[in-house]
Design a protein with these regions (language model features):
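Catalytic Walker B motif of ABC-type/P-loop ATPase nucleotide-binding domains
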Residues: 38-41
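Conserved ABC nucleotide-binding domain
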Residues: 2-15
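A short, surface-exposed alpha-helical micro-motif characterized by mixed small hydrophobic
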Residues: 79-81
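ABC ATPase C-loop
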Residues: 30-31
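Conserved catalytic motifs of ABC-family nucleotide-binding domains
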Residues: 34
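H-loop/switch region of ABC-family ATPase nucleotide-binding domains
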Residues: 73-74
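Helical segment within the ABC ATPase nucleotide-binding domain
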Residues: 53-65
Length: 114
């Protein structure tokens, strides 16, 4: 339902899937247990733009279903669209927290180098 592309290939082994399709499979497996919290660490790293967008759309659907999602990612623009709250960590410590609209260019440059 969330990943129609995988539905077409449901009888194939996971080894035959592309990297992006394998990532979708991993997320789908994690969702089978109806988690209260989903942790995604660089879930779209190294994936094609098409697959990356598909995964971000699924994250938006999950967010609307009230599933808490902790996303660790470098895609600042996409995170600003999806996130309810931001935490910036350096060496294991929170150096900034707030809402996406509060994240200024200066803060991003200082802590994220962007």
């Amino acid at each position: 339902e969330l990943f129609p592309k995988l539905e077409e290939r449901k009888f194939q082994g996971a080894y035959s899937l592309s990297g992006g399709e394998q990532q979708m499979l991993v997320i789908g497996r994690a969702l089978m247990t109806n988690p209260k919290l989903l942790i995604l660490d660089e879930a779209t790293e190294g994936l094609s733009p098409t697959i990356r967008l598909e995964i971000w759309k699924v994250i938006e659907v999950l967010k609307n279903k009230k599933i808490s999602i902790l996303i660790i990612d470098k895609s600042l623009k996409q995170l600003q669209i999806l996130a309810d709250k931001f935490y910036i960590l350096e060496k294991g410590r929170t150096v900034w927290k707030g809402f996406p609209n509060e994240l200024t260019t200066n803060t991003a440059q200082k802590h994220l180098g962007v």
